[in-house]
Design a protein with these regions (language model features):
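N-terminal, membrane-interfacial amphipathic/helix-forming hydrophobic leader that caps
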Residues: 1-215, 349-440
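Juxtamembrane helix-boundary/capping and inter-helix hinge elements in multi-pass membrane proteins
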Residues: 176, 187-189, 241-245, 289-295, ...
Length: 440
């Protein structure tokens, strides 16, 4: 397509000459502004308008449609309505994309808490109608309901229902299919292959056992990234404790649970939860936002993944892990590696939580050894494959800097609403923790 990004200097249409261009455009078909990418195109050669046109001219200054009249000539804004600058148009486009996918997180929390409230209300009604006395309740129960079953109904099941609602919303809004995310991972080997006439020799894609080993290696490296986040979390916990403001990390222990309840809870933590979260964040959201640049999509979805955990301590771990998982998804064009990494990370944490230690010192030394081993694995992975990931974080878009894209995304109303919800939840949980520590 013959493209003229902008008309020549002095050929801008004036407010008094709507539909006319002076100078060098005489005798040629006039260039048309395309709101899809904020550029002008010359269709004097008979080329069709770019996608997104069609329809009649809109008086909305944010939209400039194509003229449906004879000859297929371009439509022009009325006097005084000049097309917005490309950067402004791109900012609006980014906000529209965020408004397309981010309400899924708001729906997730709304459905989750409404479902949890309904279940809690039903349990309260059941307890009220029960005729037992306090001494009749068996141990390890909540008014006769086993602790494991109570947690499943009020904590885990609402999250599953909320995440399922978010996935249905994203599926309807984006039009993407679940099978689109489970393609065979595309990974290039480190060894150069035959010369391909390019600047660098072609690298053969991995397949079979080599590809499976690479996915395992990347998953172990992802655990190393999580361990780096845990170091920051431990520093944060110690700092809060030193200033007299203790804050507890989430407790996923299953003490007092029946065997069936333990299996069901761990099934969500280790398998179902990672799969649903990867589909939401590294699947639908990342794929929709990636049209504005991989670096932008990776950073924005990782920050949302951090806020999604609604915990003051879980800041660096989900942020760093989310960035690594997003890079895996972008690099391999598949969710299989990121899902495997997420499952392995949660499974390892769950298994280690069941290992008894004779003292706190032994537990601390085991934790330090675990952190050192997996950080070493990550360092090895990055030395071998890091060069293939670094280009993904370089944003070379001439229309807008990465900071401008992130600013547009975080100022969209779904982002602001979600951040305010996060702040409110942190304030509430912090006050409850502080009151329970000092007054109970």
């Amino acid at each position: 397509m013959n493209r003229d990004p902008y008309p020549p200097p002095g050929d801008r249409q004036t407010s008094g000459q709507a539909g006319r261009w002076s100078g060098g455009w005489a005798g040629r078909q006039k260039p048309q502004y395309n709101p899809e990418d904020g550029r002008y195109y010359n269709h004097g050669t008979g080329q069709q308008p770019p996608p997104g046109g069609g329809g009649r001219f809109s008086r909305d200054p944010r939209e400039y449609g194509w003229n449906a009249g004879p000859g297929g000539g371009p439509g022009y804004p009325p006097p005084g309505m000049q097309p917005p600058a490309p950067e402004k148009q791109l900012r609006q486009t980014i906000k529209r994309t965020v408004k397309l996918v981010l309400p899924a997180l708001l729906i997730l929390f709304l459905v989750e808490y409404l479902f949890a409230f309904a279940v809690s209300f039903g349990i309260s009604a059941y307890i009220t109608q029960a005729s037992w006395s306090f001494t009749d309740y068996p141990p390890d129960t909540y008014f006769g309901i086993p602790y494991g079953l109570y947690d499943l109904l009020t904590s885990y099941l609402p999250v599953v229902v909320g995440e399922a609602a978010a996935l249905l919303f994203l599926r309807a809004r984006t039009g993407l299919r679940l099978k689109d995310f489970f393609a065979k991972p595309e990974v290039l080997s480190r060894e150069p292959g035959v010369e391909g006439g390019c600047r660098e020799p072609e690298r053969a894609p991995l397949s079979g056992g080599k590809l499976a080993l690479w996915v395992v290696f990347a998953s172990l490296a992802g655990i190393g990234v999580s361990m780096i986040g845990q170091i920051f979390a431990m520093v944060e916990l110690n700092f809060l404790y030193e200033i007299g403001f203790p804050y507890y990390s989430p407790d996923f222990s299953t003490g007092g649970y029946t065997l069936l309840d333990t299996i069901l809870c761990n099934l969500y933590i280790c398998v179902l939860g990672p799969v649903l979260e990867e589909l939401i964040f590294r699947g639908f959201m990342l794929r929709a936002l990636q049209r504005h640049g991989s670096a932008f999509a990776v950073i924005f979805t990782s920050v949302m993944f951090m806020l999604f955990h609604m915990n003051l301590v879980q800041l660096f771990t989900p942020l760093l892990t989310g960035m690594f998982l997003a890079l895996l998804a972008v690099k391999t064009r598949s969710l299989i590696p990121s899902i495997c990494c997420h499952i392995l990370n949660n499974t390892l944490s769950t298994v280690l939580s069941y290992i008894p230690f004779e003292s706190d010192f032994a537990a601390g030394m085991a934790t330090l050894a675990q952190i050192a081993v997996f950080i070493l694995i990550f360092a090895c992975f990055w030395m071998l494959w890091g060069r293939q990931f670094l280009p993904l974080m370089r944003d070379r878009d001439p229309a807008m800097k990465l900071s401008g894209k992130l600013g547009a995304a975080f100022t969209a109303w779904p982002s602001v609403t979600f951040i305010l919800i996060y702040i409110g939840m942190i304030i509430y949980s912090t006050l409850m923790t502080w009151l329970s520590y000092y007054y109970y």
